[in-house]
């Protein structure tokens, strides 16, 4: 019975030795990268795609690849939205991107009025200010929260193993003095 198991094992080992002896395996083949890796796009909003190619039956294209941009509406006289030549939020909104949501006021009872801490528009740190929509605050939270989680879990594991080890040590000890 033993010889029947030995013969297939010997044949399998010979097959493995033959496969190993090919010498055509090289780790450098896996590391060669003929084209450089492109840097990923890190924009908040994706870049718009170029418009579609014009259709032959469309008379507006005029043979151009890109259609002409629509002219901006002329400002109406007497409109106070853009008076004085100053740049404001209305000038910035050209309709390409969706509007960003406004931060919600803090929930809770109480009336309006002024805060005792002042009304500064500083959203880049400090106490009693919202970090909603703040890229610096969100980036710090993305970095710090996993580190804090790992430290807490490590401390809990160390404490549990320490108390379990002390429980085993003290299992057979008596608190009475030894009698010789």
Curated annotation (Swiss-Prot):
Kindly give the membrane topology term recorded for this protein: Single-pass type I membrane protein
Q: Which domain of life is it from?
A: Eukaryota
Record organism: Homo sapiens (Human)
**Miscellaneous note of the record:** The gene coding for this protein is located in the pseudoautosomal region 1 (PAR1) of X and Y chromosomes.
Q: Give the protein's recorded name.
A: Glycoprotein Xg
Residues in coiled coil: none
Compositional bias, Pro residues, is annotated for 47-57
The stretch of residues making up the signal peptide is 1-21
